[in-house]
Amino acid sequence: MKVTFCVRGVLSPLLANLYLHSLDVALTEAGHKVVRYADDFVILCRSQQEAEAALMRVQAWVVANGLALHPEKTHTGDCREPGHGFEFLGYRFECGRRSVRKKSLAALKDVIRHKTRRTRGDSLKRIIEDLNPILRGWFGYFKHALPWTFRLLDGFIRRRLRSLLRKQQKRPGFGRCHADHLRWPNAFFAEQGLFSVYEAYVLARQSR
């Protein structure tokens, strides 16, 4: 079981850490396991009864300190059950699995679309130089997610680049046909130095 909270209001991470420290202490002393970043936190519980008790304890503390809980982000549930997962710090936790939150993945894809827009006149080398730091940083944070995310993301990036190359060569279409895959195979982009999030995941797993 878990209880997910978000304190309503604008608090800087430093201010939130100072202000909410006493809540951390109170919950820990009550036997609860708390994971918190700024004003966003999760309490891990062993039963529904324990989760409800934790919620009541937090509600009492928040009211006593002149704060309020975010109504849409405060809830209890069994994250071991399908459909009852929760999102925290860009990840989604459900049924014992960690996946990238849909909103986080969509935000990255928007950046990639902008960097690989078909009207961009830069060389493939320059575009890859722009992409790689973004992909490395994103992977560094989300490397604990499920591997299929990285496979699909690699495919999305290569399709975007094939479409751009087709446009630069004044070929019709969007670079999604089998002929384009043969003309610019996955190995071609690896040779150009494109960072592969899936290959990075495989290497990270091997180094454990």
What name fits each language-model region?
Residues 1-208:
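Non-catalytic terminal/accessory segments
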